[in-house]
Amino acid sequence: MSPARESGNNGATPVEPIAIIGIGCRFSGDATSPSDLWNMISKGRTGWSQNAGDRYKMDAFWHPKSDISGAFNTQGIHILKQNPAVFDNDFFGINGVEAKAMDPHHRLMLEVAYETFEDAGITMDRLEGSNTGVYCTGYSPDYDAMLSRAPESFPM
């Protein structure tokens, strides 16, 4: 990683590095880390599963005609094996009620962001109190839609 240089100083004085290079990931199947992903790909396996277990009722959406709105006609799914309800909220300083109300995607994002710092060799002690930003993205509005259908079940 090359250090950033302040503009106007002719490159004489290096300042703090501006990038941390690390990686974390979650993919379907057994790929819960970059090395797991590589192992899966290098052995010619995929994360496809014929059964989603109790996390997704495929039969409820299956229809032999692919043009039926809201239905699909696939025989399998790519799904994380990790249960998204399992989350160490205390580790992240989040109380139990707030953790239950969080979108599972956000919980996974916190875990993966932490693992990315670990992969980069950056400890939390080194980050604490620093002027550090983390940029990541993801979008899935389905959790909000589920909560709006049953607001009485919102854990508050």
Where are these regions (language model features)?
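ACP-dependent fatty acid/polyketide chain-elongation machinery
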Residues: S2-A101, H106, L110, Y114-E118, ...
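A glycine-rich phosphate-binding loop feature that marks nucleotide/adenosyl-phosphate handling sites
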Residues: D54-W62, E128-Y139
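Structural signature of cysteine-dependent C-C bond-forming condensing enzymes
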Residues: P3-G8, D119-G133, A145-M156
